[in-house]
C-alpha cells in the first residue's frame, strides 16, 4: 500500500523510509558499487505521473552515499504498463526500450527501482548497461511482487 501510494499518489513522505532501507542494503551488500541507475520512465509517463519514483529513491541514496546518478540512461519508447501482462508479454513490451545517450561512466552500476515482479525491466536495463561497458550490474528494489507466471527456484 505504501509503495503504491508513493508511486501513484506521489506521497513522497514514504521516501526516507524506503530510501534508508535501500541505503542499508547498498552499504551492507554492494560496497563495490560506483553509481546509481534509476529505472527511467518514458517522458510522457513521467509528465503524466509528475515524477519518477525510482529517480527520487536514487536521489535520496545518492545524497546519503555520495554515489553519482547516471543521467544518460533513457527509455526511448513508450510501453504499456507492466501490471497485468504475462511474463512473455512483459519481455516483448520491454524489448529494446532502454538506450544510453553517450558513454557509460559507471562501471559497477546499481539499478534502483521500487518493485520487481518478473524482473524483466531490470533484466533489459542490465543488458543495456552491460552492452555499454558495465563490469557487473546490481539491483536495489523495495519489494518483490509475486506474479502469476513466477515460480520460485525451490518449485514451491
Residue ranges and their predicted role:
Residues 1-60, 83:
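Extended interfacial segments that mediate partner engagement and assembly in macromolecular machines
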Residues 68-156:
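PRPP/pyrophosphate-binding module of the type I phosphoribosyltransferase fold
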Residues 24, 28, 59, 63, ...:
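Short, well-ordered alpha-helices that flank and scaffold nucleotide-derived cofactor binding pockets
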Residues 56, 66-68:
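Short secondary-structure boundary micro-motifs
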Residues 31, 63, 104-105:
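Short loop/helix-cap segments at secondary-structure boundaries that form the rim of catalytic
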